Amino acid sequence: MKIDPVELTKKLISFKSITPRDDGAIEHIAAILEKSGFDCEILEFGDNKTKVKNLYAKYINGVQNLCFAGHVDVVPPGQLKDWISDPFSPEVRDGLLYGRGATDMKSGIAAFITAMVDLVAEKFRFNGSISALITSAEESTEEYGTKAVLKWMESKHKKIDYCVVAEPTSSEKLGDTIKIGRRGSATFELICHGKQGHVAYPDLADNPIYKMISILNRIKDTTFDGGNKYFQPSNCEITTIDVGNSTDNVILDSITAGFNIRYNNMQTPDGLYKLIDEICFSVTNDYKLSMHSSRGAFLSTPDRNTDVMFDAINKVTNIDAVLATSGGTSDAAFIKDVCPVIEFGMINKTSHQVNECVLVNDIHKLTAIYKEFIKSYFYPTNRILNQINVIGNVPDSPLLA
């Protein structure tokens, strides 16, 4: 059986899989893979409020297991009137396929599913096994998505040796960027307390706003680190300040602020919390600090398989990719705990935007790249076996592409 990656992308877009729903996409992919001889496990995790469907599918032909990972869930489309067409009714215009998830990341999933199915149909002799890990909870309820699947795999003694996550990593042209790591994300909420009073009698009140201003200024002036060869310096951005005051003559008794630290592999969430807590305590002891951090910073040191991806990209696109660790978080942060992982996929310019779109021709190119990668992963050429240039050519400056 052979499939058309563009038609599969269209079909996946047609599923209204607003996170954490899959709307039938998981079952559709499983049906395709089962017809090609894959063993498929549809896994549902969740609680009374949320149920998340995931898929782990494996074509068994040996111990070594190459896995492709991705997510079918998408963010909400926003105002429908702003779209040139229905975001869940895929439409091709001037060589571009429009629809929610076209870039992030239904085209990537369609490409690696097609690559695997095509190779099976071509009777390619995998020197090992190939698998797919697909979730419908990357954009939101991550606890029941990839993270839960990996825990299930561990309990069943199922192993992954290497993983490619099909996130849209390219910047300007398909093939220009491979992600070998990501910064972690730590989100803080700080509440400073004071005493309510009349603005005409500040001596009888305790204005918490000044405490918050002092703390946020100290956080802003803090140098967390200087970055390193792979990562830019850790950075904090204030995202909200709220006192909920509807009048102009009252000093309220509390103020809340939110801020996010994107941190590199020199930091840990616990270390950041301790540092922020010390800054708060240096100003006041009447505060409450909380932190949420799920996906940590990670780095997959470039290796032979990075070279395999470089060569596959160059063979199809004639582009020399660069390595990067920039951008937001992804499920690769969970996968890195079980095996080496890289991310490579479509151009990221329209992800999460109105009129999200992808070049139709790029879907075919990405499929070809994944096929080349799979073949060379299992049967590396002598040039790849003797190649160590990727590790030696990592630039001295952080990977900010």
From Swiss-Prot:
Record's keyword annotation contains Transferase: no
GO biological process: diaminopimelate biosynthetic process; L-arginine biosynthetic process; lysine biosynthetic process via diaminopimelate
EC number: 3.5.1.18
Record: residues binding Zn(2+) 1: 71, 104, 167
Keyword line: Amino-acid biosynthesis, Cobalt, Diaminopimelate biosynthesis, Hydrolase, Lysine biosynthesis, Metal-binding, Zinc
The protein's required cofactors: Zn(2+); Co(2+)
Active-site residues, Swiss-Prot/TrEMBL: 73, 138
Role according to the record: Catalyzes the hydrolysis of N-succinyl-L,L-diaminopimelic acid (SDAP), forming succinate and LL-2,6-diaminopimelate (DAP), an intermediate involved in the bacterial biosynthesis of lysine and meso-diaminopimelic acid, an essential component of bacterial cell walls.
Stated name of the protein: Succinyl-diaminopimelate desuccinylase
